[in-house]
Amino acid sequence: MQRTEQERIRRESLAALRAHGIEPYPAAEFTVTHRSKRLAAEFKDGMAVTLAGRIMSRRIMGKASFAEIQDSEGTFQLYLNRDELCPGEDKALYNTVFKKLLDRGDFIGISGETFTTQTGEQSVMVKELTVLSKSLKPLPAVKVDEDGNVHDAFADPELRYRMRYVDLVVNPDVKATFEARSKVMQTIRQSFDGAGWLEVDTPVLQAIPGGAAARPFVTHHNALDIPLYLRIANELYLKRLIVGGFEGVYEFSRNFRNEGMDRTHNPEFTVLELYVAYKDYHWMMQTTENLLSDICQAVHGGTKANLNGTEIDFAPPYRRVTMRDAILEHTGVDIDGKSEAELRAACEQVGIETDDSMGKGKLIDELFGEKCEHHYVQPTFIMDYPVEMSPLTKVHRDNPAYTERFELMINGTEVANAYSELNDPDDQRQRFEDQLKLSERGDDEAMFIDQDFLRALEYGMPPTSGIGIGIDRLVMMLTNQTSIQEVLFFPQMRPEVFDQGPDEKGLQALGVPEAWTPHLVGAGFDRPEALEGLSPGGLREKMNGYRKKNKLDIPALTLEEVETWLSARN
């Protein structure tokens, strides 16, 4: 990869630091007394403090300078006076190291004394300075004016997602989003642990990808010589644990689905799954709305959150609407008692394309997804799904054509899916067999039959309610994000294609002196192929001009030397 001029200069500074006896990447622990946020809160003049962080700006003014360092909590101002930092004869730490060899982006550690400037700014007078890490690539120079307007923003989505490490440094709002994500998960853990439920881990590699209707990723286990699947859900394993005697289990599950990518879908995502014995879906609705209210309180300090200009109120109770009523209200179609042919005709009548692989469940799902879903902005439980849509759900206690299932819709998006869990092993086997028939018709999202899970149910599972909550989508809503990529540290992207980098040895093989090699690279001639078609005189003139401009302490090139390089290449 060709180095920029700034990168070349930083590498020269790196070498100069070492020449001064300063290790730019020390191994020793550096102990701090404060971070920026705590220091600002506890600040008073005359405190002895030790801070560490990344240099974000410098204002050099001769014998005195200001700098700003950034740590995990924020930024803090430093004041460096040459004679305070270097009280003895040797002023190199200030005059050379700080002023010339350090750059924006470098990590330093400092010790000093707090004081307030004449303009009222909290600052630290630096008495000691330690280089902790030299940055070899310059950070984007994002600027914020007095009115809060951002200039030269690091805003390109592809660059931000590929280089999240840079995004986090220069865009504070991004860091706040992921801190909110952490609060969401902490709040859930506190609630569930307080209820006495057990956090567990279940397999990611599975012989049968059960628990959901989705297309799995397939891999191969060489030692066992069998196909394995990345999990699409952990539901069936958690139910096995309920069979085993745990009354409440939960897991933050990393799931994988080999399907499309858009603003709400990533092939790898996080779902919270909870299963509690002796409960039903009515209890789970109440538990869910109370949990989400607590989560919003933890993130925002209240039960309301702004999402694209719409105020979402997470305070319970949430509206409850049956699937039948939702479709009837928004399409005029009554799904009750309809055959597959009638549902197919109804879909086509309202402009939904169908194919022969779609059974009753898929047709109803399309009706709701295409025509109804977007109407539910405030938190709403869509409940009582047709039995064809819910192969793992207990039949409704009052109507066997429906199931005791709900999905939580917020801002037109599904956030949670929950059931009164099916615990009748014979009924479950029949549901799996119905799914197998759909698979044979070409539905690649139909569920597999998991014989071991059926065996587990035959040992007896108590009445149980379970829920899956999409953590990524929930965080999107709580942080006012419109893309799932904004709430994933490293969203899935096509692999980046890197160039091969500089070939200094290849240049030296042509006869380029070792002293000249990095400067050819810095000038853009980073590989032997880059010299093809160049005239000896033109290359000599360019490189000697480069030597003069950068005041390089190496002999000027002769025409004969350059001719030798090019003839060796050609």
Please report, for each region that a protein language model flagged, where it lies by residue.
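Class II aminoacyl-tRNA synthetase catalytic cores and aaRS-like
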Residues: 1-500
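Compact, charge-rich alpha-helical regulatory domains located at protein termini
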Residues: 496-570
